[in-house]
Amino acid sequence: MEINAAIESLTSITDLDPTAVCDDHPNIYLRATMDGALGVMSHIKPVLSETVTTALEDDTVVSSRYAIVTAPPRYKIVEQPYTDADKGYLRGLRTPEACIMYMHYINKIISHAPANPLVRDAVQSMNLNLGLHRDMILGSYSVDDIYTRLDPVAPQIVLGGALYRILHSRNALYPKCAIGVVGPFNQWVDTAQPAGPCATPEVNDILNVAREYELPQRVVADLLIEWVLETSVPIPRGTRNRITLELQKALATHLPAGLFHDIVIVGLGIGLPPRAVSGLEEKMGIDLFWKTQNSYHGRDSVSFRGALENAAVRDCSVITSATGKTAPVTTFGLVTVRTNPPFPKLSKLVTYAPHPPITRSPFLCARVRDVYDQEIEVPHGRASGPRHFSPRMVVLRERAASVPVLTNTLHEHSFSRGYFIPIFLREYKSIYAFWSTLGLPSRSHPLYIFHVLSRSNIRTLETIPDPVPFHPKERVFMGQCLAFYVRETGEELYALKIFRLVMERGVLPMYARGDSAPVQILGFIVNICAALLAFDDTDGLDSLDMDTYDELSALGRVVWYVWLLTTLFPLYMTTATEPEFLDPMFEGTYRLGEWNYVTTTGALYPGDNIERLSVSVDYGALDEKTKGFGETLNIPVHVIGIVNQFIFPILSAQLPYAFRRLPNKSVVRHPIDMIEAVRRKLSERFGSCVNPPYVGPITPSASVPTGKYIHVMKHPEAYPEYTVEASNGTDGDSLSDDSDDESAEPTSTPASWIGDRDEKVRLEARLREMEATVRNDLLIGGRFTHTGPPVIRQPVPRAFPKVDVSLMAEAEKRSGDMLKRLDDVYDLVAKTTHMVETGGMFPVTDLETLPPPPADLLQTSVDSESRSIAPGADPVSHDLDKLDLPPAAYEEPDLPLDLPPAAYEELDLPLDLPPGAYEEPDLPRDLPPGAYEEPDLPPDLPRDLPPAAYEEPDLPPDLPRDLPPAAYEEPAPRAESSEDSTGTTGADGSLPVVSPPEPMSAPGGEPATGTTGVRGFKSERLILPRKIMSSIPRPSDALKERLSTRRTQMYDSGSDSESDSSEYDNSDSDDGRTERATSSTLDDEVERMTHSFNEWVRISTNPVATISDIPPALDPPSDSIGSPGEGAAEEVQLGADPGGDHTRAPPVADLRGAELDRYLYKESESLISVIDELFTEYVTTPAAPPSGPVVTPPVADNGGTRETHPREKCPYTVAEKYRILYTYGEQDELAALVESTGAGTDVERRVSARVLANVPVSSAVIINESLEEDQFTRLENTLYSMGLKRVYIPGDGNCLYNTLRFIAGADGESAIDFKKELLDDIRKYVRNQDPAERDLILTEIDNLAGPNVYGSGDLISFFQLLRGVGVTVVSWDKIGGRLVKLVATNQEGIPPEYIILFTNSHYEPLVTEDTMIPDSYLKDFIEWKRSLFLSAII
């Protein structure tokens, strides 16, 4: 077995799609939280939770923290099952034990990072080279606490076997990465045939000057590179070879920065096509990097950390002229580089935005927008133009680059004598010209020169290296080691495995393809340790005859050395013999203490103890001795020094669990036993936790619960597939045999233990079943899905105290009685509703015989004065609550009944809709008005129905039942309109309107004022919206600060008769306030629209209208629709004369029945009403006021009239059509009306027939038709009472985008532009998610991006996530007359913004009344209203 096969025995890396992202390289993206950056792996469910702490914690082992620990960013090891059930446990690891072992090794290494510069650089390099730039925005760490914030290091190692698959699939991940892609330039130089001396004078002059002045070789290489790029004549072969040899000399000690001229530099030359100033681009790149290289050469990790904290490009020296002089340039945004000829100004080619560094480079801190990466296909031979890329189109891993960074630490400790951040080249555009000019092979890219020369004995990439000779000294030493191992352990088969592993040809692709030596070595050591302990290939192993081998693999010696330290060193400590051949390597490097008996650490069964020796190792002495032994092993000293830094932490983790005691001697455990020891130690910590680990293998049908620990086998007999290897591989001498310290190698577990264990399994299973039953009882309980009587579940045997049977029976009886009485009440409501809907009469006998609502049904704490539920009172309280029943003694039945209305007051839900409608994320259905108010009510319907018929459980008891319907309606008139009214008896005999009760208590305990509800009629239900919204905070101060100080003052106190003529007054307000538009923008808009209609608008200066059964909003001014001579009541009309005397509304007492009802809805006009009247009056007002009685034209046969009025000019047709779209246009209705051919709606036909035939209509119909208008009036009043107002948004299909635009403060953008920007941001955000989920989201986004497509609720969620704001959506419950919270954001620290949703089809922002709203929103709304009106009259 070769090394590759050994690693593959632990990893699932076969048959991967080379075009897909590697399985072992999960997509890690950042999710912003209030505390920091939360890293999320987007593959699937986590198997390891982030709460894992310390695996091994005792006196001899340094306490280590797991990679999945507390500080952000947190990472979770995730699992995606293969289609084949035989593969994969974790992606990249086969078993939980292997994962524990990996994590244990990795964390022991990382725990030494503060004192181990090589490990520290490996961690830094891992984070840099993998391009996880987003993980560093909020998760940066210093080298001092590197072991507590591992960022993406440990998951990459664990999932991929230390980057084995990540780096092996480098071609798939980074298609144009120079490292590991091109061939060895150095080998070509060695084999190139010279073609004579150099005959080029310029080149000879450069070389002569270099010799004369003893110039450094890097300066020589720089001069030669400049000459090659500037020359325009062919270069002879001899000259090319001489230049190549000089480059080889320079690259042997230093990598000239000029060779990196394809890298992104501030504003210069990236991605230019070959025909575009290619020569200048090459020279600029070379000089620029040459001048800046020294600034970053030799930085150590500490100073390097300081440079990483800068998030913008700073102090960049750029070349400004052909002389090579430089000038500092500091930039923080769009780069403008001023250059002198012959360098052109290139600032238009590349746009930079200040961003955190994409590779943590202290030099490059910019995000690239390349304009020449792709060119538009040119039609008809025209010149092509640059194509600008949006940020979401830039794939950073393919387009990013950085400067080389050399550190002193790696100069001293690594193979490379320096390392650099990987250079991501896309097409080698510039270097190709230079390389082709020299005639060098296409696979000899200069970046690889440094790679090859700095990798010691690793010489190739694409091919397996040739084996090295197996020297006699090595043969003897290896034979002694194997013989010693077999003699001490008796494990000849394992010795054969190790021998063949070392002998086989092979090299880890990871080891040669890495971007820095520390990362390679870290992964290499961990993988080799795992392979040495767990690989199980035994094919072809039949002897230990070393004479059959003359060669060993190129890395065999390093593998052998790792095996010596991890396996033979513990054996050497405890052996009774004296292996003299190992004394020079291990003698005097350790000290053993006395036996330390550990009786219960990790024991799963009685007697299964983990015993260990107290071992103290002098790692300094061990390092010196192993380096001195390097000659025997034929391993370079510096290689031993590097490997020791990674092996020693692993050794310290293994040694305490590497021994077991026998009666006469102590022996080293089998390597599998070491893993078992670690696993058992973990089981003590996690085996009996509240959140138990996931149990079972991963198969396509398995479902791994979220947030579970990795499986620590609690009952191995249930999973023999994971224990057969441990038991068989050790020939019965496994860890479970350590049951008795004094026993002589027991081979089996005693039967008594097995019996106790089986009994324990049964008891635990029984307890789990009982706990599940209890949970199910709590979850299933309720009465929403069951129609029968209460179901008594038979008691389940459990370890709970028994419940008194009499108590159970009593509780059952009381519950059944309560539910029955609830059924009677709701049957009454249902029967009443049915009679109203069908138009039938409600039998008087039913009213007499039906039982009244039980007094104790809703026991609430009621204030004696306000009759409202006192704050803090339990809305549903009964004696049954006092009975503390066991959770699962019986199952409460599920009945299809709704809770009493009072039960929902604490839930902020409407009374008439079940809670299920609001528990789902979808928005609730808004039932049509006709379902609750039927226009064709029978005239003789009794007015004295019980309160339940009106669904008003909280009406004051002293309110007469025979009040007109207005007594039960909301909103009510304002205080000024009714406070002087004494309430006279109407002509129809109705009782006078009672005086309003005393002010009610607000939820906070303060007395309600006039602003608590609509002034005038103090109704309890008017207090309800404020009670509901009292807990909702006002919009954030940030939103108020964002808005302009120029406020459009909609309401001015008092009526100013000397106001400007461009202002319009609306004297229809009861409280005498005048509504004006004072903004200059609004004035201009109103004046322009008024001028357009000045030929049509005729408004009487003394308007008097007759109150009839036609809704007031639709009455034509100065025209009566009722019979001539009918008694008139004054109605306020819009006056053309600002100084005119506007008649105030009549007292409330003068109105009766439907008139009172309509007046209650006719509250102070809002801005919408003003705008509506501006558009509708020209239609509803005739050309001249009628001078005499209205003449009724003859009625035609078809119900119409013989009058020749054109139907399309009927004023009420237009008015009704417009009123259907009263405040917001439901898009479907608007589209239907715009496309209408004039047939009209049913409302149009009925209203037109009434007007032309002069037919009286009942008041019930009038109320129903004006319901939409009334509802908006009620909503406006409710918002006003809470100090809120709407931001009027057009209902043109973009209402959601306009609403979010307002919240985001994007006042200068149009809704279309904001929509495009938001959808683009969502596309970028989901780019790194799981492909299946990402495709679904992108498909939905593409659908939303189409024209005339409304926004969806998902956009609100993404908007909150991307913009860092909370959005709370509320809706208007037309039946309950209150606001209902639908979707709320409860993230702590995020200020909420409020949106109101109308009938699931229109969104508008809600702001405080003093919020300044930009003029642009009002202007857009007026324009939309005007277009809507024009579409209605066409």
Swiss-Prot record:
The organism's place on the tree of life at top rank: Viruses
Positions with biased composition (Pro residues): 1183-1192
Record domain OTU: where: 1284-1409
Segments for region (Disordered): 724-753, 848-1087, 1111-1148, 1182-1207
Residue ranges with Acidic residues bias: 734-744, 1055-1069
Ranges of biased composition (kind: Low complexity): 896-915, 1002-1012
Protein's UniProt name: Uncharacterized protein ORF65
Organism: Ictalurid herpesvirus 1 (strain Auburn)
